[in-house]
Amino acid sequence: MSDLNLLKSWNPKLVKNRKKVWEAQQQLVEENKKIKERQKEIEKERELDRYSSLIRDEDQKNVKRKTGLEWMYDNTSTALTENVDYLLGKKEITDTLLDLSGNNNKSEKSENQKQTIRKHYQGIEDVICSKTNHKNVDLSSDDPMAKFKAAKQAHLKTLKQNIQPTSHEYPVHKPLRGANSKRYDSGNGSRSNYKNSRYNNKYYRS
C-alpha cells in the first residue's frame, strides 16, 4: 500500500513544501548578510569618528566629516561674536551696515503694527480693536441674541415711559334725594332719622 500521507497538503516530504522551506532559509541567509554588512559599516564610521576626534591640529579641524548634527553641539552664536568685535573696535561700522539696520527696524515696526490687533470678548459682543486710528468694528449686529436683547431693552423703556402714576383717592358718594327719602321723612321722625343715619344708609356702605 502507498503512503496516504503523501496525499496531504501539509506533508513535509512533498516537493512543493520542501521548496517553500528552502526559499525561507535563503531569505534568512540574505538578511543575515545585510545585517553583517551594516554592522561593518557602522564600525568603520565609529573608527573614523575616533580618529577625527584624536586629531587636534587646526589645519585638519575643517576636514572633520560632517554628520548634520553639528548644530546640536554648537553653543557659540556668530551674532554675539560679531557684536563683540564691533564693540572692541576690531571691525568698522560702515554706511551699508547702518542702512541694513534701519531697514530691519522698519520691518520690525511694520510687523509689530500688524500684530497689535487684539480681541475683547464681552458676553455676546466680539469686538476687534487696534491701537491704531482705525475705527472699532462691532460684530454684535450679526448676532441674533444681541438683537433680541436690544429689542427687549427698548420695549422695557417704552413701557416705563407709558406708565403714569395713579392716584389712590376714592370718589365721595353723596346721598340721593328721592322718593324713598321722602317716605321715611313723612313718617315718625325717629324712624326717618334711623334709616337716614350714616351707618344704615346704603350709600355710605359702599
Curated annotation (Swiss-Prot):
One of its GO terms (biological process) is mRNA splicing, via spliceosome. It comes from the Eukaryota. Keywords: Coiled coil, mRNA processing, mRNA splicing, Nucleus, Spliceosome. GO terms for cellular component: U2-type spliceosomal complex. Residues 165-206 are annotated as: Disordered. InterPro entries: CIR_N_dom (IPR019339), CWC25 (IPR022209), CWC25_splicing_factor (IPR051376). Residues 17-63 form a coiled coil. Residues 186-206 have a biased composition (Low complexity). Involved in pre-mRNA splicing. Belongs to the CWC25 family. Associated with the spliceosome. This is Pre-mRNA-splicing factor CWC25. It comes from Kluyveromyces lactis (strain ATCC 8585 / CBS 2359 / DSM 70799 / NBRC 1267 / NRRL Y-1140 / WM37). The lineage of its organism: Eukaryota, Fungi, Dikarya, Ascomycota, Saccharomycotina. The gene is CWC25.
